[in-house]
A protein has these predicted regions:
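Active-site-proximal loop/turn and secondary-structure-junction residues that shape catalytic pockets
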Residues: 10-12, 46, 70-72, 95-99, ...
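Active-site acidic/histidine proton-transfer and metal-coordination neighborhood
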Residues: 63-151
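Catalytic domains of carbohydrate-active enzymes, especially glycoside hydrolases
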Residues: 24-47, 82, 86-87
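Alpha-helical scaffolding segments of alpha/beta enzyme cores, especially the outer helices
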Residues: 27-31, 51-55, 59, 78-85, ...
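Conserved, mostly hydrophobic/aromatic
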Residues: 32, 40, 83, 123, ...
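Conserved beta-strand positions in the central sheet of alpha/beta enzyme cores
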Residues: 41, 66, 91-92, 152, ...
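Acidic-and-aromatic substrate-binding clefts and catalytic sites of carbohydrate-active enzymes
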Residues: 17-21, 39-52, 68-77, 98-103, ...
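Histidine-acidic metal/acid-base catalytic patches
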Residues: 1-5, 10, 14-28, 145-150, ...
């Protein structure tokens, strides 16, 4: 049976408050566990950190994605070694390089994929500003060159990066659908055309929240068609700290991001279940129609 695993970003557990108060790592992990997340997004460039975090998650029956930011092909090698040691359901790679031409990208993509394939580890390339995938059109050209490239789709970066006009045009929907159709995981954040991260409950943001829910639903359906029967899709709630999060004049945030992460978790799980239920209903109707046809033929 296909599964959805909803993770919480450990980076998003940073508070960066004016008073300097931060949760300890132990508190963060316990909060993620107690809130019912399936796991966490874990930065894997620090071996000791990865070991500590994954030990906790494993002990509590949770899983994780290994996050990394290589600036060369070789910089992925220690990440792979850490994943081989500690495990991960996949590597999420932010390509911390900015080639000007598509041809300059090819050695990076081919090198990273070769290393991951040789190690038998799934590799997803994240869509993100100030990375190789910073521009929507450039990333679409990457997909032209590598049609089987597996993306982690953080759609917020393209909405604000290209400053999509509202309402979203059919053309822009089609471009985003093409990104989504290559997505094997999602990072969850809601943007507008001029803000990278919106508060989920504010009334003035509901049209953008609805848009992202629509795209994620499309993505779930797309993935379910492409993935194997026992496949696992990951969705990382990644509501970042300031300066991703908006703050008031006092430096404190305008909303409770931890509470919002829980809302996002529940919302995407409901979205996933709705897709699954609809597929079950369609299959039941199909079987009923076939039986009706067989009965009619026998008569």
């Amino acid at each position: 049976m296909q599964q959805l695993r909803v993770y919480q970003s450990l980076w998003a557990m940073e508070r960066r408050r004016p008073d300097g108060h931060e949760w300890t790592l132990e508190q963060k992990l316990a909060m993620i566990r107690d809130a019912g997340f399936d796991g966490a997004g874990v930065r894997f460039f620090d071996r000791d950190y990865a070991r500590e975090v994954t030990a906790f998650l494993r002990e509590h029956g949770m899983s994780w994605q290994a996050q990394c930011y290589p600036r060369s092909v070789d910089e992925l090698k220690p990440i792979i070694e850490h994943v081989q040691e500690f495990g991960a359901d996949h590597i999420n790679l932010q390509a911390d390089v900015r080639p000007y031409t598509l041809d300059e990208c090819i050695p990076y993509i081919e090198g990273w994929r070769r290393l991951a394939d040789d190690a038998g580890i799934a590799l997803h390339i994240e869509t993100h500003r100030d990375r190789m995938t910073t521009d929507l059109f450039f990333t679409l050209q990457l997909l032209d060159r590598f049609p089987d490239l597996r993306l982690t789709a953080d759609l917020s970066h393209y909405v604000v990066g290209r400053e999509f006009a509202w309402p979203i045009s059919d053309e822009n929907h089609a471009l985003m659908h093409r990104i989504i159709d290559s997505a094997w995981g999602f990072h969850g954040r809601v943007a507008s055309r001029e803000q990278i991260q919106l508060q989920l409950a504010f009334p003035q943001h509901q049209q953008w929240l609805a848009l992202f829910m629509q795209w994620w639903e499309y993505g779930f359906r797309s993935w379910r068609r492409r993935a194997p029967a026992d496949g696992v899709l990951t969705f990382l709630c990644e509501l970042g700290p300031p300066e991703y999060a908006m703050t008031g004049a006092d430096g404190y945030e305008l909303s409770d991001r931890w509470q919002e992460a829980g809302i996002m978790k529940d919302s995407v799980r409901a979205l996933w279940q709705g897709c699954a239920n609809e597929e079950v209903g369609q299959e039941a109707r199909k079987e009923a129609a076939q039986k009706k046809t067989q009965v009619a033929a026998a008569a």
